[in-house]
Swiss-Prot record:
Family: Belongs to the gamma-glutamyltransferase family.
Enzyme Commission number, as recorded: 3.5.1.93, 2.3.2.2, 3.4.19.13
One BP annotation, GO: response to antibiotic
Organism: Pseudomonas sp. (strain V22)
Protein name as it appears in the record: Acylase ACY 1 proenzyme
Subunit (UniProt): Dimer of two non-identical chains processed from the same precursor.
């Protein structure tokens, strides 16, 4: 990355956290105990893939509202030899799912996925076929060095011993108490005596510890054909869900080639469809490359206006063109072509907000988690995983401690569209586990939770690093903006004068206390050290590893 230099800043802010620097490894997750789990595995001789999987399992315990083995996600891996691979373990629609399985309530922007009785949000009918456990185990088997049973030990211990509830977790429970109270298992676990767990209380998950031990003994087959899978399908059958044993048996992960774009001398690498991030971050960067964004100043009216217009263009194209490539022909080459960006950029008016439609023809919820890990050998993992909404579908499979996803919400409940439901179709996602390379050397890796706000927020972090020349800590904590074509959300640190100027240009501005979730990132410095950073929007914590073994031949003598 460029060394930080003074550039104009209209939106001023102060970082609330400090970065960490190490020489032998870095683990950054959205919970300190999950970061510690990954660091423990690195110190035990594991590589970045081993550590990332250990951190993800630990997050299923410490962040039960965000991620679970009944979820799904994407892992972007850079191997020590420079190869990149994306492991797609996104959830799929059950075999019994149909395009018209929900009753739609609206076609308005921001409300297109609203359904009668929230059936695609809460309850068994909202659950898609899980891919998380199979994906993590596959990553470990292909690219890790340690056995699954060893990698699971930190999470098992955390579930058995329990951990102290943070204010962040307590707030998430409080905000979703009504939905959690509908499920006996979740109510007993998170609402003891009918009240949300409070900060400082201890959360122990004995049933879930037993499930993790079963996985340690049997591998992913414990879910995809074994006892845990039967518990899930029995619950589905009894409660109106669609997942059956055939769905679990037929589930497959996909190994995908990443999308590669370029921006001001950097190669920007991200996941391909069914994720929208790689394609549309490349598209938006191509549009922004035609402007001197850095000279406009961070948080200025012009800079925010251009971000908003680029976002609206990307969302318009995304709605008709980007989905599961097994079901929809995605025009990737066209979308990331710089000539196409030139066409779209030429239509942007600096003094007026526009309503955008797609420039070509066609053929998620805010609660996720992210892990960024690097080892001393050059392996790097940027993994975004989720059960989709806070506490997923707010159902727990009895006797297992497993919390189910509500990934069906990511589909468009209207039939006949690119994102409509079809049996076996992979869910569409905005996950953005991104990496950037300059002159053949990895510069940074980052990601965050936040549903539709994920890839726009990742875009802004990339712009912060490259155009505004922020430090890594500043880039992840900087105030954000977001729009998909309706209202323009501004975090509170964006000045009111800028908000009013944007309103004058036709933007429908609303203030938001937070756009998307806690980003975490690693920068790879020219001297070989690593810098890790996490932001104020979650419990993110970087754990750096330095030092090492004694000098060869050294002995202790008196």
């Amino acid at each position: 990355m460029n060394a930080p230099v003074p550039v104009p800043r209209v939106a001023d802010f102060t970082c609330e956290k400090k970065p960490a620097t190490g020489s032998r490894g870095m683990v950054v997750t959205n919970h300190p105990l999950a970061s510690a789990a990954g660091a423990q595995i690195l110190l035990a001789g594991g590589n970045a893939i081993d550590a990332a999987v250990a951190s993800l399992f630990a997050l299923t315990v410490a962040e039960p509202m965000m991620v679970g083995i009944l979820g799904g996600g994407l892992s972007h891996i850079r191997l020590a030899d420079g190869r990149h691979v994306v492991i797609d373990n996104l959830s799929t629609a059950p075999g019994k799912a149909t395009a018209d399985m929900y009753e739609c309530l609206s076609d308005e922007i921001g409300k297109q996925r609203d359904t009668r009785d929230r059936e695609n949000v809460v309850g068994a009918k909202a659950v898609a076929v899980p891919g998380a456990l199979k994906g993590w185990c596959e990553a470990l088997a292909r690219f890790g060095t340690l056995p699954l049973a060893e990698v699971l030990q930190p999470a098992i211990g955390l579930a058995e011993r329990g951990f102290v509830v943070t204010p962040y977790l307590s707030n998430c429970i409080t905000d979703n108490a009504a939905d959690l109270a509908r499920d006996p298992g979740l109510a007993a676990m998170l609402l003891p005596g009918g009240q949300p767990l409070q900060p400082g209380m201890r959360l122990i998950q004995s049933d879930y510890a037993a499930s993790l031990k079963l996985i340690a003994a049997e591998g992913p087959e414990a879910l995809y054909g074994g006892k845990l899978g039967r518990a899930l399908t029995d619950y589905m059958a009894a409660n109106g869900g669609l997942i059956d044993q055939a769905d679990l048996s037929n589930y497959r992960i996909e190994l995908r080639e990443p999308i590669r774009g370029s921006y001001r001398g950097y190669e920007i690498i991200g996941p391909p469809p069914p994720s929208s991030s790689g394609v549309h971050i490349a598209q938006m960067l191509n549009i922004l490359e035609g402007y001197d964004i850095g000279a406009l100043g961070f948080g200025s009216t012009d800079a925010v206006h251009l971000l908003a217009e680029a976002l609206k263009i990307a969302f318009a194209d995304r709605a008709v063109a980007t989905a599961d490539p097994a079901f929809v022909k995605v025009p990737v080459a066209r979308l990331i072509d710089k000539a196409y960006a030139d066409e779209r950029r030429a239509l942007i008016a600096m003094e007026q907000a526009k309503s955008w439609t797609a420039g070509l023809s066609g053929g998620e919820s805010a609660d996720t988690t992210h892990v960024t890990v690097a080892d001393a050998m050059g392996n790097v993992v940027s993994a975004t995983q989720t059960i989709n909404g806070l506490f997923g579908a707010c159902v727990q499979t009895p006797g297992t401690g497993m919390i189910a996803n509500n990934y069906m919400y990511n589909f468009d409940p209207h039939p006949g569209r690119a994102l409509s439901i079809a049996p076996g179709k992979r869910v569409f996602t905005s996950m953005a586990p991104m990496m950037a390379v300059k002159e053949g050397r990895l510069a940074f890796a980052l990601g965050l939770p936040g549903a539709l706000r994920i890839f726009p927020s990742a875009l802004q972090a990339i712009v912060n690093l490259i155009d505004h020349r922020m430090s890594l800590q500043e880039a992840v904590e900087a105030p954000r903006v977001w729009t998909e074509g309706g209202v323009l959300e501004l975090e509170e640190a964006i000045p009111e004068s800028v908000a009013q100027a944007l309103i004058a240009r036709g933007h429908k501005v609303v203030r938001s206390p937070r756009v998307a979730g806690g980003m975490n990132a690693i920068a790879f410095n020219p001297d070989g050290t690593l810098t890790g950073a996490a932001c104020w929007r979650a419990d993110g914590t970087p754990v750096a590893i330095s030092g090492g073994l004694a000098r060869a031949g050294a002995r202790f003598t008196i």
